[in-house]
């Protein structure tokens, strides 16, 4: 398996690359690209870790050499949030970066599974889809917005609040990947019950967890280490699916059946073509249904912004 990380010199990219070097299947190839000249050095640094994963680093304007033959591409390139910024402030810079990188993916590895980490994910995934459509290589089963960070945060916070074994907690998080569009389905968690106040507070904490990190880092960055872990979990799940492993399920922001919006985060079964099946997320509580109804206009507007950017 060949995995390419685009944006590999950044905070998320380096954390993700370190985790993948340690956790990819033996015999895999890890291809690192960033515009920054330090990137080949990041690859050399990682190459000293004794695992059977070969690492190569590429820098400069053109990511194509890093992409040829890639099975999975994870894109974390772009600028990070700073205090006072929301994810939409990132759009002006990151939209162009994602567009350019996905154009190169379309040319160099059109069959690869592409996971978009770069925020605002609600919009950057729509940009990626439009770029792939223009190139004539769009396959909705092969494009993902990586929302796993919302899932691992939900699992962590719920386990802490309820004194549960975090390894056993599973939380589906649906909708999108910013603010009110993040909807953790707390009503469905096995072995945990919440009061109405707890649901409201926990939902808000999960939605605002990114801001919690940005503020705690006091201008020194955003969530890089936890995002690296989340992206690694999702990337490894993509690979398990490609290798034919059964019952690999994750939540991700994908083009599903369009019931709510063109793109929607929901549980999916992964397989040899990426998304094998979009799974039903089950029955919503009254609180969750109200939150869903309240977020859809925001989500649809985020998606439309991406579509119009490429047009």
Curated annotation (Swiss-Prot):
The gene is mdh. This is Malate dehydrogenase. GO terms for cellular component: cytoplasm. One of its GO terms (biological process) is tricarboxylic acid cycle. The keyword Lyase does not apply. NAD(+) binds at residues 7-13, 34, 94, 117-119, 227. HAMAP family: Malate_dehydrog_1. Pfam families: Ldh_1_C, Ldh_1_N. Substrate binds at residues 81, 87, 119, 153. Disulfide bonds: none annotated.
């Amino acid at each position: 398996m060949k995995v390419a990380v685009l944006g590999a010199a950044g905070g998320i990219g380096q954390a993700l690359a370190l985790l993948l070097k340690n956790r990819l299947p033996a015999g895999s190839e890890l291809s690192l690209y960033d515009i920054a000249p330090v990137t080949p050095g990041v690859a050399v640094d990682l190459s000293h870790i004794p695992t059977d994963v070969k690492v190569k680093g590429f820098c400069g304007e053109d990511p194509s050499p890093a992409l040829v033959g890639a099975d999975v591409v994870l894109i974390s390139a772009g600028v990070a949030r700073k205090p006072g910024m929301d994810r939409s402030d990132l759009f002006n810079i990151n939209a162009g970066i994602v567009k350019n990188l996905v154009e190169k993916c379309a040319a160099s590895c059109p069959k690869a599974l592409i996971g978009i980490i770069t925020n605002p994910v609600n919009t950057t995934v729509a940009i990626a889809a439009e770029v792939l459509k223009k190139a004539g290589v769009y396959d909705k089963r092969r494009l993902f917005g990586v929302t796993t960070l919302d899932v691992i945060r939900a699992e962590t916070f719920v386990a802490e609040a309820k004194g549960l074994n975090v390894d056993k907690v599973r939380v589906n998080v649906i909708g999108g990947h910013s603010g009110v569009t993040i909807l953790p389905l707390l009503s469905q968690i096995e072995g945990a019950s919440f009061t109405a106040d707890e649901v409201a507070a926990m939902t808000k904490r999960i939605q605002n967890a990114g801001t919690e990190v940005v503020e705690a880092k006091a201008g020194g960055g955003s969530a890089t280490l936890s995002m690296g872990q989340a992206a690694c979990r999702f990337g490894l799940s993509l690979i398990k699916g490609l290798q034919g492993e059964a019952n690999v399920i994750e939540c991700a922001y994908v083009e599903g059946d369009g019931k709510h919006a063109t793109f929607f985060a929901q549980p999916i079964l992964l397989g040899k073509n990426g998304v094998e099946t979009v799974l039903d997320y089950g029955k919503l509580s009254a609180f969750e249904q109200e939150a869903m109804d309240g977020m859809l206009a925001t989500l649809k507007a985020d998606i439309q912004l991406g579509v119009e950017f490429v047009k």
